[in-house]
């Protein structure tokens, strides 16, 4: 899977990139392949060219080796072209993310290989134009190294050794991966915040891209939290998307951007992952709809799987002293935003919002586990903070 670092991020309170668009069946979505698989296929194509083998428009390449699995699975990957370049060759693959909202979809991945006959069975991996380099701790790649994750590295090594062995070649190979538009693409990802500079990352735990993968989102949330903790931060500020994060940043102006993580709908996972990494204090910023769902105790808040319980919200409003006519209107509202508009003029509005926020806080601290305090910040779409607890 690719990481969320290469995905579009949710704007808040809508249908973000964690779920397919309305009317699209997840099972019918087309899978793609990762940047790691693109790099590997390019390397295989280039090696074949160097060894004098014929060009194949589709190559069967190994997927990343998995623990406990002896022989990796394989995938057919289209190859755009192979070019002789210097004393080696370059294989070109156009990244295909399938139906996933992936910033790297359509990117030209160029993998240059050069044989090193005097370097016995050595694979040297380098990053060229458009491939990032790691500058912050907490990532699975060491500081100073090219941003190619362990999965793609193992995938590349397996494939290179496979081709070389078939040709009876026991020397070394230098592999340089390039993404000509990588630096521009990276501006639409979270790489800058993660301290990956100069381009995109080469990613892929499985080698294939599952559209709107929850696992990819969770892996990226965990990665961002790991970077923040490795930098020594004790507070993490989690939000549901871009707008709530921007408002949360204004609320905590002394914290660097690495302390802020967009968790989308994965509230329980994100809070638990933050607690596991040793954060002492957490903040959660959201708008009213996500707040109500958290107050309901829902661990995942996307509309497709987590319905808003407006009759329950109405009951909470009644308990807070909201006028009965407004309570009934809240129960029959179409959206959380409409319910908030109904409550706002009432004298008991602030009491009601405080009560809902306290319920959300209780569930957030349950998700985080004992000993971790969570502060909830409720924002209005106009940018004001309505309450906190």
Curated annotation (Swiss-Prot):
One of its GO terms (molecular function) is cobalt-precorrin-5B C1-methyltransferase activity. Pathway: Cofactor biosynthesis; adenosylcobalamin biosynthesis; cob(II)yrinate a,c-diamide from sirohydrochlorin (anaerobic route): step 6/10. Its EC number is 2.1.1.195. InterPro entries: CbiD, CbiD_sf. Residues 1-25 are annotated as: Disordered. GO terms for biological process: anaerobic cobalamin biosynthetic process; methylation. It catalyses: Co-precorrin-5B + S-adenosyl-L-methionine = Co-precorrin-6A + S-adenosyl-L-homocysteine. SUPFAM superfamilies: CbiD-like (SSF111342). The keyword Acetylation does not apply. Keywords: Cobalamin biosynthesis, Methyltransferase, S-adenosyl-L-methionine, Transferase. It holds the Pfam family CbiD. The keyword Methyltransferase applies. It is an enzyme of class 2 (transferase). Belongs to the CbiD family. This is Cobalt-precorrin-5B C(1)-methyltransferase. The gene is cbiD.
């Amino acid at each position: 899977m690719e990481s969320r670092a290469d995905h579009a991020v949710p704007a808040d309170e809508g249908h973000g990139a964690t779920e397919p668009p309305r009317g699209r069946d997840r099972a019918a979505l087309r899978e793609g392949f990762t940047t790691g698989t693109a790099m590997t296929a390019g390397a295989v194509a280039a090696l074949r060219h160097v060894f004098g083998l014929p060009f194949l428009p589709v190559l069967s390449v190994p997927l990343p080796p998995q623990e406990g699995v002896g022989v990796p699975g394989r995938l057919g990957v289209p190859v755009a072209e192979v070019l002789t370049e210097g004393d080696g060759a370059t294989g070109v693959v156009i990244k295909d993310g399938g139906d996933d909202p992936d910033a790297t979809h359509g990117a030209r991945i160029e993998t240059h290989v050069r044989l090193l006959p005097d370097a016995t069975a050595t694979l040297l991996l380098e990053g060229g134009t458009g491939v990032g380099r790691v500058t912050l701790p907490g990532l699975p790649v060491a500081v100073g190294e090219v941003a190619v994750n362990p999965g793609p590295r193992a995938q590349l090594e397996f494939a290179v050794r496979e081709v070389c062995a078939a040709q009876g070649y026991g020397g070394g190979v230098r592999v340089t991966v390039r993404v000509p538009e990588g630096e521009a693409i990276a501006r639409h990802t979270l790489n800058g915040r993660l301290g990956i500079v100069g381009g995109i990352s080469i990613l892929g735990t499985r080698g294939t891209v599952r559209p709107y993968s929850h696992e990819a989102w969770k892996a990226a949330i965990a990665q961002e939290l790991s970077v923040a903790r490795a930098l020594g931060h004790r507070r993490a500020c989690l939000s549901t998307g871009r707008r709530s994060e921007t408002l949360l940043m204004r609320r905590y102006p002394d914290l660097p951007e690495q302390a802020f993580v967009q968790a989308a709908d994965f509230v329980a996972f994100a809070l638990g992952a933050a607690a596991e990494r040793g954060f002492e204090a957490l903040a959660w910023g959201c708008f009213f709809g996500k707040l109500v769902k958290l107050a309901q105790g829902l661990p995942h808040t996307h509309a497709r799987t987590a319905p808003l319980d407006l009759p329950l919200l109405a009951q909470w409003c009644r308990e807070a002293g909201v006028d009965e006519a407004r309570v009934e209107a809240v129960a029959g509202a179409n959206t959380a935003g409409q319910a908030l508009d109904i409550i706002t003029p009432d004298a008991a509005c602030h009491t009601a919002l405080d009560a809902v926020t306290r319920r959300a806080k209780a569930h957030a601290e349950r998700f985080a586990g004992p000993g971790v305090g969570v502060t909830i910040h409720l924002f209005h779409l106009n940018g004001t903070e309505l309450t906190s607890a």
